Amino acid sequence: METTFDVRGLAKHSPPAMAFADVFSELLKRPTPLMRRFLQLVAEETGGPLETLARQSQQVTRRHFGKTMRLFAPLYVSNECVNNCSYCGFSRDAGIYRTTLTVDQVVTEARHLHGLGFRNILLVAGEHPKFVSEGYLQNCLDALKPFIPTLALEVGPMEDDQYTEIVGHGAEGLVVYQETYHRETYTQLHTAGPKKNFDWRLDCPERAYAGGFRRIGIGALFGLANWKFEALALCAHLEYLYRNCWKAQFTVAFPRMRPYAGNYEYQPDPELYLPDKAFVRLIAIFRLLFPQVGIVVSTREPAPLRDAIATLGVTHMSAGAKTEPGGYTGAGSDDLHLTIKGRRVELQEKSGCEKATEQFQIHDTRSPAEVAAMLRGLNLDPVWKDWDESLLALT
């Protein structure tokens, strides 16, 4: 039985005849050998104790990545959105304080992050063509590229020709989480906007690859559907992408639901929730099955847990993150407003202390310097820069 995914020799593969959305349902009915291996490992009675998996995962990680941890920061540029997603603080019908940063304000935020050491920034925006309009992201990339060498995007899905243009302006990475791979749950949770289209989002990584992206991140938001189903689907998706988009590097993440605007009292459903031990087990399993994949853990997770898993398989961590536009410097706070049915509505009163509403609450509130110190204490080298244009000549 195949126990790991070997990327060697993939250049011989011809382009896929069908997109992942076309084969996904069939894969769930007839799992590949790698998926069957996942199912074996995820159950403790057949996969062995967590301690053994964690030790093996640590060894494989050191072999492929050395004793390093790549650090990045999300930079939210807009919390406007046309989608209604019942689990998201940016949801269209949420009565939140919204703003979209100007390009100059994006630069202000990025220079602040640069001063903290970051050279790897993820630009994040809600999906709203009126506010995050044609050319906006390109202008942001043009302004940041001279001093931020590693730029990635987490924005609404696009056509492959749009991705080609984005890549031409300096973006090298794209992150798109399916949220949930359970089609019925997805339909229930997404009630308005282009995000309603399950297959359009599912095939987004392939369009990004066709558009020229060579660093692609996928994941599911754990807590929306049964965590074992989500993890198996994520395994299937990652295996498909490795086989059919073989020139790209991939990262995978297992973000867990956190309190958010509209539901700050959020409590996880015990029937769906990914508990800590299972979370660590997934990190170890994905490392063993996909030795070359990057594994991302964000500040959604508590500091003690992040410290404990830093050496076990994780390769990328965010640090000091803010999940609202202007969160690092207060940029854009002078333009706060509501958006109702696509129309901007001014606030009736402003105290001067308001800020844009965050997408969700983070858990690890330590500064980037504190996270870096923690990593060094674990004998890991914090890596702030993860890309150089000269590497493009090698692809």
Map each language-model feature to its residues.
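N-terminal cationic-hydrophobic initiation segments that often serve targeting/anchoring roles
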Residues: 42, 61, 114, 145, ...
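Canonical Radical SAM [4Fe-4S] cluster-binding loop centered on the CxxxCxxC motif
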Residues: 63-105
